[in-house]
Amino acid sequence: MAVPKKRTSASKTRMRRSHHALAKVNVITDAKTGEYRLSHHVCMTHGTYNGKKVITDNVNTNDNNNNP
């Protein structure tokens, strides 16, 4: 079984783990609502992306589905 000959110093251990840190989340404020949202993602309150409507509101004016 492989065993290290010398003890790894704290400096070497920390240098090895230097890239293990979590990346910061890219959060921006929406220009229209002022709410926080992820960058390059659709605004879920209005369904817009880059100033254009990409998610339509599915409002059913015909409520025949609920009647028996």
Curated annotation (Swiss-Prot):
Any one Gene Ontology BP term = translation
Q: Which domain of life is it from?
A: Bacteria
Database matches in Gene3D superfamilies: Single helix bin (1.20.5.640)
Q: Which GO terms describe its molecular function?
A: structural constituent of ribosome
CC annotations in GO = large ribosomal subunit
Q: Where is the signal peptide?
A: none
Q: Tell me, what's a Pfam family for it?
A: Ribosomal_L32p
- Key words of the record: Ribonucleoprotein, Ribosomal protein
Is Ribosomal protein there in the keyword field?
Answer: yes
**What family classification does the UniProt entry report for this protein?**
Belongs to the bacterial ribosomal protein bL32 family.
Q: What is this protein called?
A: Large ribosomal subunit protein bL32
Biological source species: Orientia tsutsugamushi (strain Boryong)
What taxonomic classification does the UniProt entry list for its organism? Answer: Bacteria, Pseudomonadati, Pseudomonadota, Alphaproteobacteria, Rickettsiales
